Amino acid sequence: MSYVVAITGGIGSGKTTVADRFQALYNINIVDADIIAREVVNPGTEGLIQIEQHFGPQILLDDGHLNRAKLRECIFSEPSEKQWLNDLLHPLIRSEMQRQIALSTSEYTLLVVPLLVENKLQYLANRVLVVDVLEQTQINRTVNRDKVNHQQVKAILASQASREERLAAADDIINNDHKIMT
């Protein structure tokens, strides 16, 4: 079994960039929770079937994919709906992460999990690497990358673990406040 290093950090911290650099330099496998979260709601999956049964057919786009904007409306206006969705998806995502880790053939595996601390998933890794940035850096990067406004980013930040909570869970820290040279 591979030695698992979890990479976590808040939105806009540069987790994916750091993971991609490690992969390029050391040819190691990456298990990415965000990618898995999208895959478990692809058309025909148990996740999407359950979501459609719960929210109704209007939660789907014409092509059968999840209408993410509609789902966001449903869960952010009603906390119990967000909890229902988390209760459905988190076990599916966790199970797939564990499956991919078990199949990893590289000496090290990077487990990229934005909400590692919030979901208490540190047990999945041998070490936790926090990609740390100042809040203003997170806001600027996310506004530029996702074309959202400052208030939307601040709302996301408020729903995530604090910088202090993440740093307390860290075995190692990368300060990523500077522009990465390629």
Swiss-Prot record:
Record has RNA-binding as a keyword: no
InterPro entries documented for this protein: Depp_CoAkinase (IPR001977), P-loop_NTPase (IPR027417)
Gene Ontology molecular function, alphabetical: ATP binding; dephospho-CoA kinase activity
CDD domains (alphabetical): DPCK
A single BP term in Gene Ontology: coenzyme A biosynthetic process
GO CC terms: cytoplasm
Reaction(s) the record says it catalyses: 3'-dephospho-CoA + ATP = ADP + CoA + H(+)
Domain DPCK residues, every copy: 4-182
Compartmental location: Cytoplasm
Keyword ATP-binding: yes
Gene3D superfamilies tied to this protein: P-loop containing nucleotide triphosphate hydrolases
Any Pfam family the entry gives: CoaE
Annotated metabolic or biological route of this protein: Cofactor biosynthesis; coenzyme A biosynthesis; CoA from (R)-pantothenate: step 5/5
Residue positions binding ATP: 12-17
Enzyme class, UniProt record, top EC level: transferase
Reported function: Catalyzes the phosphorylation of the 3'-hydroxyl group of dephosphocoenzyme A to form coenzyme A.
HAMAP family: Dephospho_CoA_kinase (MF_00376)
Similarity annotation: Belongs to the CoaE family.
Protein name stated in the entry: Dephospho-CoA kinase
